[in-house]
Curated annotation (Swiss-Prot):
Protein's name in the database: Glycerol-3-phosphate dehydrogenase [NAD(+)]
Alphabetic keyword roster: NAD, Oxidoreductase
Protein residues bound to NAD(+): 16-21, 48, 119, 175, 344, 373
A GO molecular function held by the record: NAD binding
Protein source organism: Colletotrichum gloeosporioides (Anthracnose fungus)
Amino acid sequence: MASLGADKKHKVTVVGSGNWGSTICKIVAENTKANPDLFEEAVHMWVFEEDVVIDKSSPYYDPAVGDAPQKLTGVINKYHENTKYLPGIKLPDNIIANPSLQDAVKDSTILVFNLPHQFIGNVCKQLRGHIMPFARGISCIKGVNVSDDGISLFSEWIGDGLGIYCGALSGANIASEIAAEKWSETTIAYDPPPMDNSRAPTPRSNSPANGNGIAPLTPVEMQHKDARGRTSKTKLTPVPAEYPPLDHQIFKQLFHRPYFHVRMVSDVAGVSLGGALKNIVALAAGFVDGRGWGDNAKAAIMRVGLLEMVNFGKEFFGQTVHTGTFTEESAGVADLITSCSGGRNFRCAKMAVAEGLSVEEIEKRELNGQLLQGTSTAKEVNSFLKARGLEKDYPLFTAVHGILEGRHSVDDIPSLVSDS
């Protein structure tokens, strides 16, 4: 595809190398190789360096090395496989595992973030002043941060922390299935900043940047809006015209594969909220399934849960959130279905009810020190709603928190959500 006269290519870096980070890097590297007119072929993947030992049963076992620890980056670059976090999956040979965060992002114009959310602040601190000022980001980090003070999107944490614009990727995306190239879909939310050269209008403003024979934008139209539709405090640097436009078309070319279908939207808040709130609903689905109430009850939970997800987005993000993001996209209803069918929030809640234990007890027993996202999100959302006197407007979210706290039982759910 033509790059509209651009004479420079985009360099891509993936920040993070867990199972999902490595999977996304595999996808991106396949597409940079397939689109040499748009992207530099080499994709750097930042790896938090650690020592690994290659097991004797591995095809990569070297008797000369034996059980001696090896650097994970060295293993990835030599064998083109992340033997620790994505074993058995061959990675493209144009992926370069890099233990230096600042070196990995050098000269990159597209940054893909895929790491645990608790590391965002530290990573942004290390990157500040070391990235291209006009770089653009995509956050693959599911969820949002909810406190009594408000709701913040991880994409905005990144964008504000680095002074760039950052979109979000989320959906019914189980990393191991995608890495094995089993067909799935995802949603990418990206609302191209109005000062960037774009081949299509930004859906919210309907005002494409000039450069395509369109009248120049006014200073007001040129202002970048945040996910709530307010003028952003972050002052963006436009992407230079010598690069291919960073818009829906190019991000689809970067992420879309025959086995990984991408739908583009502009609703960053809706996509981000879907990835967080569905975990609360998944707990409720696990509760009723553990009680043995069957598929009808679980379907009722998903209906009420989806309604509350939409209402929450509309109430706290206003005009920027679209109902269709929740009802039509992978980041909404599809991710909800997956999470309510076999996700770990669902499984742990189901086991807790079936065995007469608390979710916390199951969590400690089953997750090897990891924590459920649903329990923390339920607590944060309840505190947020309670501070605003809105608990009754979200009966399912409130019921889940009540069950986790021991104030309600699963048997109370039908009466608690009866008016939904």
